Amino acid sequence: MQNKPSSYDREDLLASSRGELFGPNGPQLPAPNMLMMDRIPLMSETEGLFGKGKVIAELDITPDLWFFDCHFPGDPVMPGCLGLDAMWQLVGFFLGWVGGQGKGRALGVGEVKFTGQVLPTAKKVTYEIDFKRVINRKLVMGLADGRVLVDGKEIYVAKDLKVGLFQDTSAF
């Protein structure tokens, strides 16, 4: 992909979920409701803590988001696993952005720590992904550290997020 955009809006992310952004064999983001971001203001192959790439994405929080009604009635909080999934989504998106082909699959995470929560009173969740390694050969895989912030305060940290792109997922 030549002259790659360094940012994406909601319509771009929805195009990715339909398989229209990175070609017919490229990775896709999930569709709503599992699409856990509204925009990506930064994509870089050279920035980040390790100098191997950085992604920043944002999710606007409103009290009517679907997960607040069911998790938990009377005690609404965004499930932590959705923030973790968003970080995996962004690692896969980055792999497509750098030209990787295949279907994205989360392969694991080394460590996750939750030190806060996303409540309906929050305004914005920010995801920051710093790439440690990107392999784009026969094997396509990204390894990154990530963090989730709510209204500027760090609440989750994930070390060694791992996502691969696969031509054939039938053996999974």
Curated annotation (Swiss-Prot):
Protein family membership: Belongs to the thioester dehydratase family. FabA subfamily.
HAMAP family on file: FabA
SUPFAM superfamilies the UniProt entry points to: Thioesterase/thiol ester dehydrase-isomerase (SSF54637)
Claim: Lipid biosynthesis is one of the keywords in the record: yes
Catalytic activity, as annotated: a (3R)-hydroxyacyl-[ACP] = a (2E)-enoyl-[ACP] + H2O; (3R)-hydroxydecanoyl-[ACP] = (2E)-decenoyl-[ACP] + H2O; (2E)-decenoyl-[ACP] = (3Z)-decenoyl-[ACP]
Pathway: Lipid metabolism; fatty acid biosynthesis
Name of the protein in its database record: 3-hydroxydecanoyl-[acyl-carrier-protein] dehydratase
One Gene Ontology MF term: trans-2-decenoyl-acyl-carrier-protein isomerase activity
Record's subunit section: Homodimer.
Entry GO terms, CC: cytoplasm
Subcellular location(s) per record: Cytoplasm
Alphabetized UniProt keyword annotations: Cytoplasm, Fatty acid biosynthesis, Fatty acid metabolism, Isomerase, Lipid biosynthesis, Lipid metabolism, Lyase
Cytoplasm is among the record's keywords: yes
InterPro entries from the UniProt entry: FabA (IPR010083), FabA_FabZ (IPR013114), HotDog_dom_sf (IPR029069)
UniProt-annotated catalytic positions: H71
